[in-house]
A protein has these predicted regions:
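Canonical Rossmann dinucleotide-binding motif of NAD(H)/NADP(H)-dependent dehydrogenases/reductases
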Residues: 48-74
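Conserved glycine-rich Rossmann-like NAD(P)H-binding loop of the short-chain dehydrogenase/reductase
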Residues: 71-85
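Conserved NAD(P)H cofactor-binding loop of Rossmann-fold oxidoreductase domains
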Residues: 127-134
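Catalytic loop of short-chain dehydrogenase/reductase
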Residues: 134-136, 163-235, 247-248
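C-terminal helical subdomain
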Residues: 152, 207, 211-215, 220-223, ...
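Short C-terminal tail/terminal secondary-structure segment
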Residues: 299-321
Length: 321
């Protein structure tokens, strides 16, 4: 049984296509960026510290609110309308925000986002909360977006992250349900060059059985990748960690709870130690710790926060019979 993924809302088109076109007018006070071009702004951007938020859902939003005061937020999403809506909320709360479109499964698109971010100032924080879930996509698409896409984000932003910068990648409790991999498989997921990652034998269609399996191995791969990238990021004086949330009440989670695996998800909640699902704000609190000065000794780590569901899966009422 998988945990509810943390990416929110289905993409408006299949990842891998070109960057989205610029849409209608943006909210007042918000700059829109696409293909690294600023097309609308209310004034010169003077902020020098930039927080990049990839994925306009409520989890990325919750972390951003806690770490972005006095900084410039670059909010990127596959869907421009999602980015605009989230940016308006942040702007209304007093944050300075730009928006951009990004397809994390495209190196060209991720690189363009990096160029946009560095043109705004020093990238001091990255929040990667984009992805697709087992109910949204095929195994191949999940691997391309959730596994390869995360590797691209870590690689590209690892080249420019500022000293004392930090990154949080949203993984999932699902990665903790996958049986143990071999040391060789762990190393392959952690260190294979991004553009060779999807050619690994363990990721071929005859090995990845279904969308749930693809999601679990992608999320396990995220935490392994972050551990390896922490070495490289550390040489720049920066940190990177993953958070593996369980069932967090987001729009996507509510879709999952009413979907074909909904009964299983509800049982997870019922038998967990916490006896409830989580909130984006709770994930935001952990994200703020990891990205802030109090988390300065934490890097290359994965934080499982699922109310005890994984504990119940391995050692409690959810344990496989």
């Amino acid at each position: 049984m998988s945990g509810v993924p943390c990416a929110e809302g289905p993409p408006s088109r299949v990842p891998g296509s070109n960057l989205a076109e610029v849409g209608p007018a943006v909210p007042l006070g918000v700059a829109r960026l696409a293909n690294s071009e600023m097309t609308t702004t209310t004034g010169e951007i003077t902020m020098t510290n930039v927080i990049v938020v990839i994925g306009a859902g409520s989890i990325g939003h919750a972390i951003a609110r806690r770490v972005s005061a006095g900084k410039h937020v670059l909010l990127a999403d596959l869907n421009q309308q999602n980015a605009d809506a989230a940016a308006k909320v942040l702007n209304d709360a007093g944050f300075e925000v730009s928006t951009a479109t990004v397809d994390v499964s495209s190196r060209e698109s991720v690189h363009a986002l990096v160029q946009t971010a560095t043109a705004l100032g020093d990238v001091t924080g990255v929040i990667h909360a984009a992805g697709v879930s087992p109910t949204q996509a095929s195994p191949a698409t999940i691997l391309k977006v959730d596994l390869y896409g995360t590797a691209l984000v870590l690689e590209e932003f690892g080249n420019v992250i500022a000293r004392s910068g930090s990154c949080v990648v949203i993984a999932s409790q699902s990665g903790h349900r996958l049986p143990a991999l071999t040391a060789e498989q762990n190393a392959a997921l952690a260190t294979t060059p991004a553009d060779e990652l999807l050619t690994l034998p363990m990721l071929q269609p005859d090995q990845v059985r279904d969308s749930l399996h693809a999601y679990q191995i992608s999320k396990r791969g995220n935490s392994l990748r972050v551990m390896a990238e922490a070495v490289r990021w550390g040489k720049r004086g920066a940190r990177v960690n993953t958070i593996s949330p369980g069932i967090i009440f987001t729009p996507l989670a509510r879709d999952e709870l009413s979907g074909p695996r909904g009964e299983g998800y509800r049982r997870m909640i019922d038998v967990s130690a916490a006896g409830r699902g989580g909130t984006p704000d709770e994930v935001g609190t952990v994200g703020a710790l990891l990205m802030g000065p109090d988390g300065g000794f934490i890097t290359g780590s994965d934080f499982l926060m699922d109310g005890g569901v994984t504990a119940a899966y391995w050692y409690g009422e959810l344990a496989p019979k």
